Amino acid sequence: MSFSHFDTRRFREHGFTLIELMVTVTVAGVLLAVGIPAFSKLIANNRIATQTNEFVGALNLARSEAVRRSQGVSIRSTNGSVDFASGWKIFNDPGLTGAAPAASDVLRESSGLAGKTTLKSVSRSGSSPSFTYTVSTGTSIVFNSLGGNNAGTQAFFRVCDSGDTSIKGRILQVSTVGKVSLDSATATCP
């Protein structure tokens, strides 16, 4: 009987050694410990961006409806405060008052923003590049039949994550002609 032709491949062990497995688990743990906080911040930043875009869409809808209908259209916080995070209503406002609408005048209503996002009407003071933004008394913005901001002044909104002040907020600016843009300044969130 000759063992030279004996196939030893059948008897080899397959798999990982305990040391290889421990090294792999350790490396994976380190990567997760570093990656998860950064990923959480990325998710929060994306949530702020998405919800900012949602409100920009609402402002643009109100402006375009004012032009299309040739009459005033307003957007007002649902609860009548400076806090738009709980929701807003877009409604016909031929008197250009921004006052709470009748149910029949409402064109669109939002249930608000999800999560810990805040959206407040703010006023700007100071000079560039060190503007400061403080909560204002504005509960609505009125677009006239030409699509302009009926107040004749700029309006500002601050979008923030109330759960994490390290996340940079965003400032929305509505110009006197009604154009909505993202202000280059980042909001300092309280």
Where are these regions (language model features)?
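N-terminal helix-rich module
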Residues: 1-10, 34-47, 53-60, 64, ...
